[in-house]
Amino acid sequence: MSYPLSVEKDGIKIKPEQMKPETIYHCIFQNKIFIIYKDHGEILNCYEIEEEEIISKVKASNKENIEKILEEYIEKENLNRQ
């Protein structure tokens, strides 16, 4: 299965049919991180991160570390999924 997010010059293309519920997906577009996930009710949720420190960490990290960085950010900002 391919990654359900792709970045194009016009924006982010999302393929919700490829998303697993409660799984976090991310991409970087226009120097912002977008965190997108589909909840158990099939509703898409999106968060935009503009903090340069987090963006720099994500750009410099591998996949496993990116997930940890984003999970820590979500917890710190109290964006926990319901």
Predicted regions and their residues:
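Mixed-charge, Lys/Arg-enriched low-complexity segments
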Residues: 49-82
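Generic short amphipathic/hydrophobic targeting helices enriched at N-termini
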Residues: 3, 8-10, 45, 62-65, ...
